[in-house]
Amino acid sequence: MLSCEGSVDYGVLHLKTPVLMILGHSDCGAIKAYLKGFNEETYNIKRELDFLLPIINKTANELNFEKQLSTTIQHNIDYQVNIAYKKYRDIVKNKKLTIIGAYYDFKNEFNKGYGRIIITNVNKNKEQILDLSEFNEVRNNVNEIYVGRLIE
C-alpha cells in the first residue's frame, strides 16, 4: 500500500473499485532480505522496505527464521490493511469498499493446500470473517472460501 499509494488512490477514488486486496505471499523475498539485513542493497530498495521496521520489531523474538518470516508477512498484511482502512474509512463505512488482507500460501503453511489464497483480515476484522455481510454474495457463488491466521 505504502509503496504504490497513488495507483491505489486512483483505483479507489476514481474507478470506484469495490474491493482492495492486500496480498502477501509465502517466502516473500523482500521481507526475507529485510530480516537478514540488507546492507548491500541500494538506497531505493532500502527506502521501499523501511516501513517494515515496526513490523519486524513485533517478530524479533522468534527463534525460528521460517516462523519469523511467516509471522512478519502476516503482520505486514495487517499493517497494510490498517493503513488502507485509515485512509479510506469513510468509503468502507458507506459500504462502497471492502479491504481484504490475504496470504498467497504456496508453501501450504495454513494446511489448506498449496497455492491457496487465505483471507486473513477484512476491514481490520480478523475474526469470524465468513460471518461478515461482505461475504453474503460470495458464499452463494464459490465452493470454498479459505480463511485463517498464523498469528493471533
Show which residues each predicted segment covers:
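Internal, conserved structured core segments that host functional sites
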Residues: 26-27
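Divalent-metal-activated hydrolytic enzyme cores
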Residues: 1-18, 30-152
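Conserved functional hotspot residues or short segments at active or partner-binding sites
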Residues: 22
